[in-house]
Structure formats: C-alpha cells, structure tokens
Amino acid sequence: MITTSAISTIREHVKTWRSKGETVAFVPTMGNLHQGHITLVNEAKKRADHVVVSIFVNPMQFSANEDLDGYPRTLIQDSDKLMAAGTEILFTPTPEIIYPKGLAQQTYIEVPEIGDELCGASRPGHFRGVATIVAKLFNIVQPDIALFGRKDFQQLMIIKTMVEDLSMPIDVIGVETIREQSGLAMSSRNGYLTIEEKHSAATLKQALDSIVNAIQRGEATQQAITTAKKLLITAGFTPDYLEVRNANTLRQVTAADSELVVIGAAYLGKARLIDNVSFSRHSS
C-alpha cells in the first residue's frame, strides 16, 4: 500500500490506471476506522480495479463548539487495517494541503434545502464543509465510483445531489450500515460512550424501529415519534430530532410516498449518535 499526502502522487497513479482502461473506487474517511469502513473498502474492491482511501479530519465541517481537536486520530492502526483490507493508496493530506489559503478564503459548495435541515439545522455549516471536502477529494482522485455508509444517510443524499447537480461523472454508492451485536450502528464517535452508555445506546435503533412498526400498523406518524422520544429519554438520551422523510429525496413525506426513511439524532453523554431505517409504508 502506498501512503502519500501529495496530490501529484495520487494523480500520477490514477493517470496510469486510466491509460490501461482500469477503474478507480474511492472511500473518503476521517480515520479512526472500524468495521463499517472496512466493509466500504471490501465493497469497493468488488466494484473497481483499484481502491483509494483518504483519511482527513476536515476542519471545515466542525463548528466552534464541536470536537475537532478531540476527534480520535489513529493513523498507524488505520493504516494497518487498510493494508490488510487490500487498499492500494492511502491519501493522508494535511489541512495546509487541502486548504492552502485557509478556511476563510476557501471556495465552498453548499447544497440547499436538504443541507439545512435535520443534522444541518443542529450543526450549521456542517454539510457545507462535507460537500466542499468531498468535491475537492473527488477532483483530486477522480474516481469512477465512491462509496459511503448509509448510516450517514443525510450526508449520502447531499453528496448524491451535489454529484448530480454539478454533473460529476461519479457513481455514488451507499453501503448498508454495519452494526454492533446490540444493534448500535458502528461509528467513530461510539468511542465517546462509557460502558454503561454503550449498553443504552442501542435504544436509538429500537426507537427508530418502533416508529417503522407503528406506521406500518397504520398509526399516526407524529404519535409514533412522540412515543419513540419518550423511549429515548427513559434510556438517558436527549433527543435532537426524529423524523420520517421520503427515502429517495429526503423531502417531507406526501401521501403518495411509499418508500420512507425514519432518521434521527440524539445525545447520550458526550456522544451525538445518528441512525436511520429505510422502510416501505405498508409492510409486505
């Protein structure tokens, strides 16, 4: 595995692969890798001739009161995991390489509407930072496909929208969420949970499932959400939001929509956990 922080090195390798008619898959990450990330790499290997992974803790997507400085940086362990998984190039740029003019002078990309709702409402500017870094990494790596976990469902939809709106020749693929045995979605931020909190954390998935089951039984959506919030509060969570949206657009649900997603975020101790469950309005 080649590890580099140089944009020119990435481009040289991609140019060589392209000259042979070979395809490139890209998995962007912020490091502190878990099995969910490795699943993305494994899926990338199935879909393309070459796999590039990036590790970059992106300062643009953190607000002033968030955990940029405390975000876990585990490059040695991450590198070992990626090498074992068969990654060919690991791209590890510094903020100075990505944002040479500094954040204040950086051109940015903003996806309207869906970038301002849900997690975007709780974390102003977050998805502007996400869209900007992903667009920049796409320009550097120039992949045929890029893979993202469906756990970050809103992020996935925003990136798909950006790629479509800007006519980027990249196939964005969402990969199913990898979960702990308890049902808790794997996340780098699970490391913020105490042992006791980790036992309670699976309640978020249970709350989302309860909304799905209630809607499929014909119950009112708002009542299902209210009941689920009570379940979270009892388990020690502070709910941020729980909502049901169109699973294909992330827009508000209309009577005609059948493919839905229940999406939520809640605080547990020092961690802000997110999760989602896609479902059909009427159970089969």
UniProtKB/Swiss-Prot annotation:
Pathway: Cofactor biosynthesis; (R)-pantothenate biosynthesis; (R)-pantothenate from (R)-pantoate and beta-alanine: step 1/1. Its EC number is 6.3.2.1. It catalyses: (R)-pantoate + beta-alanine + ATP = (R)-pantothenate + AMP + diphosphate + H(+). Keywords: ATP-binding, Cytoplasm, Ligase, Nucleotide-binding, Pantothenate biosynthesis. HAMAP family: PanC. This is Pantothenate synthetase. InterPro entries: Cyt_trans-like, Pantoate_ligase, Pantoate_ligase_C, Rossmann-like_a/b/a_fold. Homodimer. GO terms for biological process: pantothenate biosynthetic process. GO terms for cellular component: cytosol. The keyword Ribonucleoprotein does not apply. ATP binds at residues 30-37, 149-152, 178, 186-189. GO terms for molecular function: ATP binding; pantoate-beta-alanine ligase activity. The reaction proceeds by a bi uni uni bi ping pong mechanism. It is found in: Cytoplasm. It comes from Shewanella frigidimarina (strain NCIMB 400). Pfam families: Pantoate_ligase (PF02569). Gene3D superfamilies: HUPs, Pantoate-beta-alanine ligase, C-terminal domain. The active site is at residue 37.
